Amino acid sequence: MKSVQFCFLFCCWRVICCKSCELTNITITVEKEECRFCMSINATWCAGYCYTRDLVYKDPARPNNQKTCTFKELVYETVKVPGCAHQADSLYTYPVATECHCGKCDSDSTDCTVQGLGPSYCSFSEMKE
């Protein structure tokens, strides 16, 4: 029986430790309206699980802040979008996470919706790799 308990605890520990909030590689789609097409690029962003809870009884004296895996530090990188008209600005600047943590989602700089457009959304039909 002790070996079963140990195995259960080990599996729980493994899930918590391995799926924590951390940097991960993602592919995002960038677009410039002036260029009329999209381009896929690789970037680093935060992904994983954070301990959170949703109270059954809402207490106004105790705010219910859900924690999410989000960036703690980020830098901006710039890529040149090919195929733009000569007068158009062909540079696209995007954020790249360098450090992650579990914290409150900042809606001023992050899409905090339950399901956003997603990193591969493109409003144009033509896609460049």
Curated annotation (Swiss-Prot):
Signal peptide range: 1-18
Glycan attachment points: 25, 42
Pfam families documented for this protein: Cys_knot
Keyword check for Secreted: yes
GO molecular function terms attached to this record: follicle-stimulating hormone activity
Example GO BP: G protein-coupled receptor signaling pathway
Subcellular compartments: Secreted
Superkingdom in the source lineage: Eukaryota
GO cellular component terms attached to this protein's record: cytoplasm; extracellular space; follicle-stimulating hormone complex
Disulfide bridges in this chain: 21-69, 35-84, 38-122, 46-100, 50-102, 105-112
Keywords for this protein: Disulfide bond, Glycoprotein, Hormone, Secreted, Signal
InterPro entries linked: Cystine-knot_cytokine, Glyco_hormone_CN, Gonadotropin_bsu, Gonadotropin_bsu_CS
The protein's role, per its UniProt record: Together with the alpha chain CGA constitutes follitropin, the follicle-stimulating hormone, and provides its biological specificity to the hormone heterodimer. Binds FSHR, a G protein-coupled receptor, on target cells to activate downstream signaling pathways. Follitropin is involved in follicle development and spermatogenesis in reproductive organs.
Subunit annotation: Heterodimer. The active follitropin is a heterodimer composed of an alpha chain/CGA shared with other hormones and a unique beta chain/FSHB shown here.
Family in the record: Belongs to the glycoprotein hormones subunit beta family.
Name assigned to this protein: Follitropin subunit beta
Species per Swiss-Prot/TrEMBL record: Panthera tigris altaica (Siberian tiger)
